[in-house]
Amino acid sequence: MKNFIQIFTILVLFIIVSCAGSKGEGVSLQDRFNSGMGNLEKEKFLQAQSDFKYVVMRGTGSDLGDDAQYYLGEAFFRNKEYLLAVAEYEKLTRRMAFSPFVEDARFKICEAYRIESPKYYHDQEYTEKALERFQEFLDDFPNSNLNDEALVSIESLREKLGLKLYETGILYMKLDEFESAKMTFQTLIDMYYDTDMIQFAYQGMVKALARNKQIDEANAFLGKHKGRLVKSELYADAQKTIDKMKKVVSKDTN
């Protein structure tokens, strides 16, 4: 009798555990997806990530799985885990090219790199990646409603890269490395001609030429870009450097 009771108790416990397990396994992908959307709305991003990962793993190839892949990227993006978001968005864009979320995912990849772009004095890898992705976005989605926003971001990122080059040129000037300064200012002129840094590049080039004792070249360059330098109130400073170096050269030859 005692053994019977023990066996009966074990069977009852087994049935309870089995039922509990079946209930958990019985949660549908749609239920888990809905849970993820709810958690995303409530800004419970870690829980949302867990929900969407579950749906992605078990719903591969389904519309629900494709949607979950996008929202998994969203859960990372909204949690400011931008590089992880990029990885998830790229899974969507590579594997699910016909998803209605592809355009937004492509734009969010651009935005993620833009946000990760640091101050100009740091390495600009993410700035360059952002520019590349924004340009690809414009090429692939020429009629997108997001294009104006993309163009504004491109302009801002190009200004940053132009500023970095300008400050590099100024550093060379301080080190009396005038040939290197000239090369840097010329690169700025060639690559970032459409930014506000162009006027400072003109001024820097005049001063680099003058400090390098290339007075004729400095005068010629100043004359060529006089209008822009006068307008930006940088002409007088550039001319002052030429006049100063003229005296130095004259003194050296006497």
Locate the predicted segments by residue.
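Acidic, polar-rich low-complexity tracts and alpha-helical solenoid repeat scaffolds
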Residues: 4-6, 15, 19-254
